[in-house]
Amino acid sequence: MIEAQGLIETDRLATLSVNGSGSLFWDSVASLYTSVYVWIPLALVAVFLIIRNVNPRRILLVLFLLAVTVLLCDQLSSSVCKPLFHRLRPTHDPNILNMVDTVNGYRGGLYGFFSGHAANSFGLAMFFVLLVKHRWFSLSVLIWAFLNSIIRTYLGVHFVGDIVVGAVTGMLIGSITYWIYSMFARKDKKSIDVRGSSLLYTRSGFMRSDVYLFISVLFGTYSVILILSCFN
């Protein structure tokens, strides 16, 4: 019990160290970053990446498993763990709620363990990392997932521990759904893609030009968020 209480206190301190900044600019950045709408262009490019580079026989399977990844992460968080563990969000924790900075008065629901945002983000990121197999792409999507997750702590609606458990859970689910995909791909011998130069294609046969397009749109979105935040 003493060790558990120590972990809880450490988690609270870590959370308060990440939460808020007193800056309207960074508050705006955090708010925009967690908006679904700002990521629509990147989502469209991700679908384009799949359609252009995955064998037509497996495109629907990939899209289906991506949806399953999100569904499993979301439901395990919201329908199983949050009602089961009843861990209050920082914004509702009586021990620290008066010390937590919020943005636009947003406090989230009552319970926050574990973070569905972190699980979804890392679940999708892990699936894409294993699917595309490109170093800079992998680094880019993992950074995206990390930022998408830790910003929830900045906003005060998740403890750092919620984020860590959500991230690990998401990566596990993303790995499992990709494994399911790989089993189907191995059975479908006719769908094996043989690509040419490694300068043009990743190890999994994705065109590097398409991968770099995705990365460019990702960092372009970061730039748009920063620019828009200057005027909010």
Language-model region placement:
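Hydrophobic alpha-helical transmembrane segments
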Residues: 34-50, 64, 117-120, 140
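Interfacial segments of alpha-helical transmembrane regions
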Residues: 48-76, 137-140
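Alpha-helical transmembrane spans of integral membrane proteins, capturing the lipid-embedded, hydrophobic core
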Residues: 40, 63-71, 75, 163, ...
